[in-house]
């Protein structure tokens, strides 16, 4: 993937730099940041620019605001970043308004300006070129370090790159690391290569499953999506999550796996309950015996032992999607145990963003994993073999 223009290929000295970051961090009801991994991941690129005598303008989105509201302000991000960098962060009140433009114009070498939430501008998600042009006009160099949004053709990710030539745009360190990791994983995995796929829906992972099959040695399917596969095999799954319209696709994946010699593992028992709540009664049952009206909400202890055995000889593990409804304590055990087993082994372990990263953080295993992707959707699309708009825009034309 070395045909992507890197920040290291660009002469940054004393220039004004725009860095598109991904500061889309989780917050509690009081807007306190509960996990600042994404902010910390951006620091190497920011420091590199400062070390080159640059002035730096940072931009990100946060959540999906319908209108401008303090709930989605990047103010808490600027405070956390200031603490992590031990440096003042100048906060703009807007994005391309008078406040941002004046502060951008007066920005001196070594100073950092953070623009307000990009999605307060309606044009951002529409890939609006006028917004992109306004943003581009503030700086001399554009750096994308926001892997988590590279699968979206948005104004600050794709349209903006049209206003910079190859000597003035490139990928930051985090973005490069993410892309290199994903492409090596797909092209040269150490074997046995095991994919552990979970989460609630088959529909979201269908393309990734299809693309992974020819590349993996074993495939573990857990989480809510496992029930569509179990149903396809003729099991009675009670009230468990089912995507009826995908039964045929599930069957195709199982057949394709068989033909390719891939060993596919599904849960053999589940934690069943009549309702998805902390107070509901629960019991462990084999998948053949899910009671009528009950639903499977986590993998059971026998499945945990089986999956542990399956990954015991793995050299590479790619994990995307929890094994159950991990947000509810009593249905989180399967996911937490999987996290422990994956992190304890000697395999190269790659965790695909989003919910899975939250599970790993909750299990206290983050430091033991080889690599935790900062982008759920983007990491899935790379595994699906798709070209991400934000990455394509940074390719060197000579190599096309």
Curated annotation (Swiss-Prot):
Its EC number is 2.7.2.3. Coiled coil: none annotated. Its main location: cytoplasm. ATP binds at residues 205, 296, 327, 353-356. It is an enzyme of class 2 (transferase). It holds the Pfam family PGK. Keywords: ATP-binding, Cytoplasm, Glycolysis, Kinase, Nucleotide-binding, Transferase. It comes from the Bacteria. The keyword Transmembrane helix does not apply. Signal peptide: none annotated. Substrate binds at residues 22-24, 38, 61-64, 119, 152. GO terms for molecular function: ADP binding; ATP binding; phosphoglycerate kinase activity. This is Phosphoglycerate kinase. The gene is pgk.
């Amino acid at each position: 993937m070395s045909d992507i223009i890197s920040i290291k290929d660009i002469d940054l000295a004393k220039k004004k730099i725009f860095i598109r970051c991904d500061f889309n961090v989780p917050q509690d009801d009081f807007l306190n940041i509960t996990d600042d991994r994404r902010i910390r991941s951006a620091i190497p690129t920011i420091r590199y620019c400062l070390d080159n005598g640059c002035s730096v303008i940072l931009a990100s989105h946060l959540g999906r605001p319908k209108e401008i509201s303090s709930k989605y302000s990047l103010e808490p991000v600027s405070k956390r970043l200031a603490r992590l960098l031990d440096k003042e962060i100048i906060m703009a009140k807007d994005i391309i308004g008078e406040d941002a433009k004046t502060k951008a114009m007066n920005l001196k070498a070594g100073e950092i300006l953070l623009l307000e939430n990009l999605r307060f501008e309606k044009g951002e998600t529409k890939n609006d070129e006028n917004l992109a042009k306004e943003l581009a006009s503030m700086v001399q160099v554009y750096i994308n370090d926001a892997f988590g949004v590279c699968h979206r053709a948005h104004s600050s990710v794709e349209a903006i790159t049209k206003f910079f030539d190859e000597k003035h745009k490139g990928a930051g360190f985090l973005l490069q690391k993410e892309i290199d990791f994903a492409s090596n994983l797909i092209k040269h995995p150490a074997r046995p290569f095991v994919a552990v796929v979970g989460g609630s829906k088959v529909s979201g992972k269908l393309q990734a499953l299809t693309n992974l099959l020819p590349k993996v040695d074993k495939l573990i399917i857990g989480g809510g999506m496992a029930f569509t596969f179990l149903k396809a095999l003729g099991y009675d799954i009670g009230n468990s999550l089912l995507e009826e319209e995908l039964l045929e696709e599930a069957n195709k994946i199982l057949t394709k796996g068989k033909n390719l010699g891939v060993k596919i593992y599904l849960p053999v028992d589940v934690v069943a309950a009549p309702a998805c709540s902390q107070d509901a009664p629960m019991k462990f049952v084999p998948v053949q015996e899910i009671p009528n009206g009950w639903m499977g909400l986590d993998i059971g202890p026998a499945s945990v032992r089986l999956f542990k055995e399956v990954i015991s000889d793995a050299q590479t593990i790619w994990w995307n999607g929890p094994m159950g409804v991990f947000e509810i304590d009593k249905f989180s055990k399967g996911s937490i145990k999987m996290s422990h087993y994956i992190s304890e082994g000697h395999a190269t372990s790659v965790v695909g963003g989003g919910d899975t990263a939250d599970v790993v953080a909750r299990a206290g295993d983050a430091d033991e994993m080889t690599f935790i992707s900062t982008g759920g959707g983007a990491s899935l699309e790379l595994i699906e073999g798709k070209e991400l708009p934000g990455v394509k825009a940074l390719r060197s034309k000579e190599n096309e």
